[in-house]
């Protein structure tokens, strides 16, 4: 075997590939974009809330909307009889109810007006009044009349109350109005709302055949208006 020859010069072997370049990576770049978008979204929402709040304040300062006012100024109860065992309630009740629009710039469209009569929590009559438009600073007088008969079943406690009030000649009757109203400001008409009006403190004396009453009652009675 021939002896190995020492290397007298440089060794030229296969070329060694250069090291791969290190990738450039910005830590948190994707997260930073998400935070920026979220921050921008929050700023836009806050700006919209502030703009709407300022617009609502300006609108209120200019228009100064006020609640509609309902009062019962007169009532005539000429019949209120409940018979058994058929449980028929016969009634005749007429009311005078002025409705006041105190607003200077807002008109009101009463698209639907329902009046409900209750005794001891039992509804015994419902009527629908004629729709109308009410202008600025205007009073419109409603005259709902409940007349007829209906099946009304009272429990023992309600029957005792009815008997006691029959003896006294004064009946505690509730009138509730359910409305559909639109507001008009200039040429603009706003969406329909459904306010509720409750006239709960009506202690009405039964009128006698000669037109007198068994006891007196105090008018006007203010009704509760709730949007």
Curated annotation (Swiss-Prot):
May play a role in plant immunity. This is NDR1/HIN1-like protein 10. It comes from Arabidopsis thaliana. It is a single-pass membrane protein. It is found in: Cell membrane. One of its GO terms (cellular component) is plasma membrane. Expressed in senescing leaves. The gene is NHL10. Keywords: Cell membrane, Glycoprotein, Membrane, Plant defense, Transmembrane, Transmembrane helix. GO terms for biological process: defense response to virus; leaf senescence; response to other organism.
